[in-house]
Amino acid sequence: VESALGLTLELDDLSKRLGAQDILGATWIQSKTVVIDQSLEPSENPAMEGRFNFTLAHEAGHWVMHAHQIADIPEQATLFDISTAPSIVCRSSQRKDSMEWQADRFASYLLMPEDRIRSYWREIRGGLDQYMAFEEIEAIKAQSEYPIPVTQVAKDMAEHFRVSGQAMQIRLEGLKLILAEQPEPDLFSG
């Protein structure tokens, strides 16, 4: 991010810095600065490496896709100075607007390219057959309060790609490699 995009990367306690909870990353467009919450720092918290990588790629996505839009707003220079509020704030509980959805998609494609995902899927599963995960997902839902249940195969692949299990689960479902819901019965099959 620093060399490829010319951005400065910092780690900080974003809840304290910005006075709000659950902030994972923030971008200051004018100063070309990306700040990731220190709770995600992989050397201090190895279990958060996947979340750190995805958050960093997500913020890079904002820079690549949205910096020009935000920089074109006349008030931006005075409104969003490094000493005040960031141009973009990303929260873990935030409802996804189009910019957040686009940055998530950018991060997903960057960290989990389709050809590499399909190649590794083939390697560990012996082919490209879809995994019918609805029974495993129902069992996970019964034991967990997480909004997106993560299957074991998604966890295994997440470790290989160094992303979070949740990010991998979403990507695998998007590529139709994991079927999360049981299909409706077809009247004409059988």
What are these model-derived regions, one by one?
Residues V1-G190:
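Active-site hotspot residues in diverse enzymes, especially metal/ion-binding acidic/histidine motifs
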